[in-house]
Structures are given as C-alpha cells and as structure tokens.
Amino acid sequence: MRFEGEKIVVIGGSSGMGLATAKMAVAEGAAVVIASRSEEKLKKAAAQIKGSVQTQKVNIMEESSVRALFDKVGEFNHLTTPGSEAAMGPFLDLDLPTARKAFDSKFWGQYLAAKFGAPRIRPGGSITFFAGIWSQRPVPGASVIAAINSAVEGLARALAIELAPIRVNAVSPGIVDTPIYAAMAPDRKEAMFKEVSASVPAGRIGKPDEIAQAVLYLMRNGYTTGSTLYVDGGRTLR
C-alpha cells in the first residue's frame, strides 16, 4: 500500500472531493485526519471511511482555530485543502462582504493551513491546494472565484520555492458532481450539468473520485512541485 505508515490531513474531508480523497487515501494504507466546521458531518463521514480516521473541528477562516488544529494533529506527511466557500454573481452586484468572505475561506483558509501545517510536515511530504478552472476559463458571474483560484495557483508556485523541499501543488477541478449542488432545484441542476457536459471534450461532469485520484498522484509523485493539475474533462481547451 503506497501510503502505509503515513498520515494525511484533509481539511474539508467531510463531504464531496475531500471525503473521496480521504476514503481513497485510507484504502491505500494512510491514517487520515479529516477536518471541517461541522461535527455532525464529520461523524457521518468517519462512518463511511473504512480504516484509520480521526476527526477534528476547524474553522479555516479563523487563525487561532487553524493553529489549534495542527497543534492537535502533530507531525504528518501530506496536507490537502478542498473545503471552502464560494461567491457567485454579477460583478457590479456582488457586495464586498460576500466577496471577502469567499477570499477568507478559499484563499486565506488555504494560506493559513499551509502556514501552520508546513512546520509539521515530515520529510518527503507535500501540500495540495484546491483552485478551479475559472482561473483559466472564467465565465460571467464568476469574477471573484476566478480571482481566488488564480491567487491559489500563484501561492502554490511561490510556496513550492519557499517551502522546498516540501512539495506544493494545486488541483484545479472542473465542474464535479458534489453535494455543493444539493440546494439547487433538480431540474435546474440537470439542465446545468447537461449544458456543461456538452461543452467539454470528455462529454460529462466530473466525479469526486477522479479529483481524489489527482490529489493522491500529487502526493505520491516526488518530482512534481509548483504545478497546477487541471482535472476538468478538457474544459480549459474550449
């Protein structure tokens, strides 16, 4: 098993791509720590993971909470940070507090995770951030998230140099079928997925397991650092 004897921290590991990553890592022998704000979601996620898993509550928008998380976790091998909030809407209509909250979650949250997690990473370890394809192919209504994703990719490149030999990369998913869309009306969700599927060379929406595979690849490949891996069904080509 590739990750036997290693500890992996997944912030945002209670659902979606984070949960898929945690499951896959445990299946490959890792001891996993999943962290998120909701204790209830953490308990449900832990029940789905067959193997060594610990849960920790954290608010990635609070520096003291992130610092406390890594004080509890101690030394580990790999960190990934898929959990965050987003802000969508027309640029001229989107209020500043909403935009700032999204930055606090997706950019500053990952920044804090790297800041307090990096000193605990064992030799040969890595950090894998989460960005998104709108950094490369923005659409109307996604100006804030496009800017955040670009900032995350830039942070990964900069920290790959500054934190070396810790490897730092980013995964940039396309549209993936996760619980984030659960609040949408079923017919609206189906229409959106159909439209996106028709626009990408792969001809379909992504699956959480496919993003998890990309994350584990970046963890295990010792010669990949400072890279952004686009897992988007070819969306960046159109």
Name every feature range the model reports, one short phrase each:
Residues 165-167, 225-226:
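Short, small/polar-rich loop/turn modules that mediate ligand/substrate recognition or access, typified
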Residues 204-231, 236:
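C-terminal substrate-recognition "lid" of short-chain dehydrogenase/reductases
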Residues 99-103, 107, 111-112, 126-164, ...:
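Catalytic loop of short-chain dehydrogenase/reductase
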Residues 81-100, 182:
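Conserved mid-core segment of classical short-chain dehydrogenase/reductases
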Residues 66, 90-91, 98-103, 192, ...:
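Substrate-binding pocket helix/loop in short-chain dehydrogenase/reductase
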Residues 14-16:
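Conserved glycine-rich cofactor-binding loop
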Residues 189-210:
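Catalytic Tyr-x(3-8)-Lys segment
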Residues 49-64:
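Rossmann-fold cofactor-recognition segment
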